[in-house]
């Protein structure tokens, strides 16, 4: 057993014991014995004995016991997560190696210096990096903000008990605090009774910044600066902000009628309020600390006749921040003109801070300047006055419908009936026309009015508060031009990045020609004024074609875009729309970035961070810092040491794998007439739509699999542990390649091609979490007899996938090379197994009894969904 295993088990045992005390206090010893019997049964079952007994004890639970049993195992899993997260950041002995996340940047910089990169070029490249992490809301982020704060406090107590020199009384005090926090969490309802609004989701995102990223960014920058100095003798300039944040929360209206123009306006104002409030706290601390009198002439000129010039300048800034916060707050309820002292430009925030910083250095007080003042400056450069840049996202069909209404009103015919050439000709002409397209008396329908109102909000908002306008389900050049025209008509006079999102297999294959067409159109380059941004969709392409074909289509699309932009001498910014799960393009960010096509990460990288992964990757400051380090190092490495392009043999084999993969995937998902009904019966998919998990509906419209959003599609299969979308297709594709005698070539690709290695590693990870026996238990409780053979067939395919991956990696067990990860999975299974069996029982009762919303069965079902999501650490 490794050191991490032993410590992790100790912490989990302690937290479990304290939770047991809490449960005993509420329900008595007999009930706690029942929980313990179920837990031990699950543990024994993993060793192959008591399955029937475990199922029977769960099936015999009375209606009153369902919810507390589900809650007990849900809380066990959340506490196991806290212990695991803490193990990633716990205090290490001097003799132990620092974790990879801490070493990765210093080691990379040393390697780059050894390979001949000059100190100046490295410092310049690091300072110029543009990495943007786009925080998105997530229907399956089931943990409430209240509980997340309690979990963070529990993690802090685990850290406190790690100190070697604690007295017995101090250790006892920590245990008492842990007991109280666990009791508070247990007695707090873990599930929302009502769906969160888009504004609630945005506030959740701001809370992650306030409680974690606000601390993590300056610490991360300080360490990056130290690593750069150690390797080159140079420092990061004050204006460097290699990692910034954007958000979709309150801006993503694709398929979500609850995100309106008014919501977008409210979220933009809340971000300004929150930013001003956070800077006020910083400036208050600085004013208390910077009591020095000696100052530069420039600072004295700004401070006026003051014996404490730093405090005088900071007081002026404090007044302006207070005015900004008060104005933003007042504007939430009524349109309020901004007073003269409201901050509008980031320079207004930076100038007084830089003045103080430079003055302290000039006067020999650099050690003071480089403390909290430098941290505040780093935050101001990273977060600015608007905290995050808000993207707007809408479906291309909404823009086409608006254009049709406009052209029909003007007597020009129906835009949607025109071919692509007619559309481009009309849009190009109107974009260059100085007169407005819309007459003042035009009365649009409600849908078109909402599209236009959103464009007007964009026009009214400060440019620096906004990111990109993303067009989902984009497929043609006219999709981009239509948005540019609607923005122009609404008074958007500055350039705004209008970004096509290519999501299906066909659209990914067509991405290159679409961008090439745009770049050759008259006037398009002038409107661009910056890089051409293109978003690559991972979720819908995988749902459409399976991950084998989708991954290769994404790779080829990026290669073609790099080539076209190079030919056209335009900079390219690729925006990766990844989910938290492998079926939605998720996986370790560091490996994913290093597996991108050569030239596609040229100092720029933009990616979505999904709701439930935001908490795991950025919820605690120390863990956030580790993940920021990984992003920074990976983007720098991919920029300066891009991987080699694949050989013709690798390409040919990848083409074959993709073709075999998509055929196998679609044979099951699209061509088997029983498949949709099997999916609905064997997973909680139907019930997920009823649960108050997010502000967005689970379906785009009525219909089969294609109408389902990618998230509930993945979520359903994850809950039953079949994990089908992440692996289906690979088992056939790899088996056929081996039958053709291409095993050696597959091994070479895995060894030498980061793209292929990363795909196989992520496939192995998801197969290690999949569990055919758990999936079978759902079938036995929920599926009609005529559909059972399909379930058996899918489990056979899962077994085939496991065998072929083991053959390829030369291991006897999945993840044998990663004992820590295996231990984390094993530890959780003891608590997950009862929840899966309980969920199958709850689904059976719910469907049989047609239960009311809010009933104990429905509540317990919700808790089981939350617990399994927490236990698997990725959901949809």
From Swiss-Prot:
One of its GO terms (biological process) is tricarboxylic acid cycle. Keywords: Carbon dioxide fixation, Lyase, Magnesium. Belongs to the PEPCase type 1 family. It is an enzyme of class 4 (lyase). Its EC number is 4.1.1.31. Pfam families: PEPcase. Gene3D superfamilies: Phosphoenolpyruvate/pyruvate domain. The keyword Oxidoreductase does not apply. It catalyses: oxaloacetate + phosphate = phosphoenolpyruvate + hydrogencarbonate. GO terms for cellular component: cytosol. Its cofactor is Mg(2+). The active site is at 138, 543. Forms oxaloacetate, a four-carbon dicarboxylic acid source for the tricarboxylic acid cycle. GO terms for molecular function: magnesium ion binding; phosphoenolpyruvate carboxylase activity. PANTHER family: PHOSPHOENOLPYRUVATE CARBOXYLASE. This is Phosphoenolpyruvate carboxylase. The keyword Secreted does not apply. It comes from the Bacteria. The lineage of its organism: Bacteria, Pseudomonadati, Pseudomonadota, Gammaproteobacteria, Pseudomonadales. The gene is ppc.
């Amino acid at each position: 057993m490794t050191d991490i295993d032993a410590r992790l088990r100790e912490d989990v045992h302690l937290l479990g014991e304290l939770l047991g005390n809490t449960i005993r206090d509420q329900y008595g010893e007999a009930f706690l014995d029942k929980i313990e019997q179920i837990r031990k049964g699950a543990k024994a079952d993993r060793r192959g004995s008591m399955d029937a007994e475990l199922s029977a004890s769960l099936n015999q639970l009375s209606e009153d016991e369902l919810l507390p049993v589900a809650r007990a195992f849900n809380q066990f899993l959340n506490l196991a997560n806290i212990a695991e997260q803490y193990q990633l950041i716990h205090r290490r002995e001097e003799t132990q190696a620092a974790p990879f996340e801490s070493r990765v940047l210093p080691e990379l910089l040393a390697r780059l210096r050894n390979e001949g990169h000059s100190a100046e070029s490295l410092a310049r490249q690091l300072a110029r990096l543009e990495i943007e992490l786009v925080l998105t809301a997530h229907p399956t982020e089931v943990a409430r903000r209240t509980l997340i704060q309690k979990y963070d406090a529990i993690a802090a107590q685990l850290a406190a008990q790690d100190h070697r020199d604690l007295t017995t009384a101090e250790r006892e005090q920590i245990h008492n605090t842990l007991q109280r926090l666990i009791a508070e969490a247990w007695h707090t309802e873990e599930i929302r009774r009502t769906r969160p609004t888009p504004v609630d989701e945005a506030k959740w995102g701001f809370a992650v910044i306030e409680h974690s990223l606000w601390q993590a960014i300056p610490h991360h920058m300080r360490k990056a600066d130290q690593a750069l100095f150690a390797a080159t003798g140079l420092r990061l300039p004050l204006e460097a902000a290699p990692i910034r944040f954007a958000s979709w929360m309150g801006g993503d209206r694709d398929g979500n009628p609850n995100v309106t123009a008014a919501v977008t306006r409210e979220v933009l104002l809340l971000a300004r309020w929150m930013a001003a409030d956070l800077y006020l706290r910083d400036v208050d601390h600085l004013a208390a600390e910077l009591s020095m009198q000696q100052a530069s002439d420039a600072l004295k000129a700004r401070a006026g006749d003051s014996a404490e010039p730093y405090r005088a300048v900071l007081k002026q800034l404090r007044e302006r921040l207070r005015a900004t916060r008060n104005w933003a707050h007042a504007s939430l309820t009524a349109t309020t003109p901004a007073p003269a002292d409201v901050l509008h430009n980031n320079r207004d925030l930076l100038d007084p801070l830089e003045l103080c910083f430079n003055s302290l250095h000039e006067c020999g007080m650099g050690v003071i300047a480089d403390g909290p003042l430098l941290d505040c400056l780093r935050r101001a450069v990273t977060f600015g006055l608007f905290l995050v840049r808000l993207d707007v996202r809408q479906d291309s069909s909404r823009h086409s419908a608006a254009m049709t209404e406009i052209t029909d009103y003007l007597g020009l015919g129906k835009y949607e009936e025109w071919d692509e050439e007619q559309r481009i000709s009309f849009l190009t002409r109107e974009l260059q026309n100085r007169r407005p397209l819309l007459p003042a008396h035009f009365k649009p329908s409600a849908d078109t009015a909402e599209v236009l109102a959103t464009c007007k909000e964009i026009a009214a908002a400060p440019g620096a508060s906004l990111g990109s306008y993303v067009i989902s389900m984009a497929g043609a050049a006219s999709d981009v031009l239509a948005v540019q025209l609607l923005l122009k008509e609404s008074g958007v006079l500055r350039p705004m990045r209008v970004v096509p999102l290519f999501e299906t297999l066909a659209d990914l294959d067509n991405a290159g020609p679409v961008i090439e067409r745009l770049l050759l159109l008259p006037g398009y380059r002038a409107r661009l004024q910056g890089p051409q941004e293109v978003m690559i969709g991972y979720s819908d392409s995988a749902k459409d074609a399976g991950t084998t074909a989708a991954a290769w289509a994404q790779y080829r699309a990026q290669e073609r875009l790099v080539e076209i932009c190079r030919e056209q001498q335009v900079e390219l910014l690729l925006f990766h729309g990844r989910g938290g799960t492998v079926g939605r393009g998720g996986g370790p960010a560091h490996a994913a970035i290093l597996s991108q096509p050569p030239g596609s990460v040229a100092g720029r990288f933009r990616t979505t961070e999904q709701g439930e992964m935001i908490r795991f990757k950025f919820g605690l400051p120390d863990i956030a810092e580790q993940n920021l380090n990984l992003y920074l190092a990976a983007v720098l490495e991919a920029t300066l040491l891009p991987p080699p392009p694949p050989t013709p043999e690798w390409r040919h084999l990848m083409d074959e794998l993709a073709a075999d993969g998509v055929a196998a995937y679609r044979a099951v998902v699209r061509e088997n007439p029983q498949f949709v009904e099997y999916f609905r019966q064997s997973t909680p998919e139907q019930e997920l739509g009823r649960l108050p998990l997010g502000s967005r509906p689970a379906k785009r419209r009525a219909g089969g699999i294609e109408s389902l959003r990618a998230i509930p599609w993945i979520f359903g299969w994850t809950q039953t542990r079949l994990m089908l979308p992440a692996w289906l297709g690979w088992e056939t594709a790899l088996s056929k390649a081996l039958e053709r005698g291409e095993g050696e070539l597959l091994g070479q690709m895995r060894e030498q091609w980061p793209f292929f290695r990363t795909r196989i590693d992520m496939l192995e990870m998801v197969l290690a979490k999949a569990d055919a026996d758990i999936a079978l238990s759902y079938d036995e409780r929920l599926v009609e007899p005529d559909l059972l053979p399909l379930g058996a067939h899918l489990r056979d395919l899962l077994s085939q996938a496991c065998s072929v991956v083991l053959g390829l990696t030369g291991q006897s067990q999945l993840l044998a090379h990663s004992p820590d990860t295996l231990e984390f999975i094993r530890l959780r299974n003891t608590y997950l197994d009862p929840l899966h069996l309980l969920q199958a029982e709850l689904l059976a009762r719910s469907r049989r009894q047609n239960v009311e919303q809010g009933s104990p069965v429905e509540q317990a079902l919700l808790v089981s969904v939350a617990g399994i999501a927490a236990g698997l650490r990725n959901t949809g």
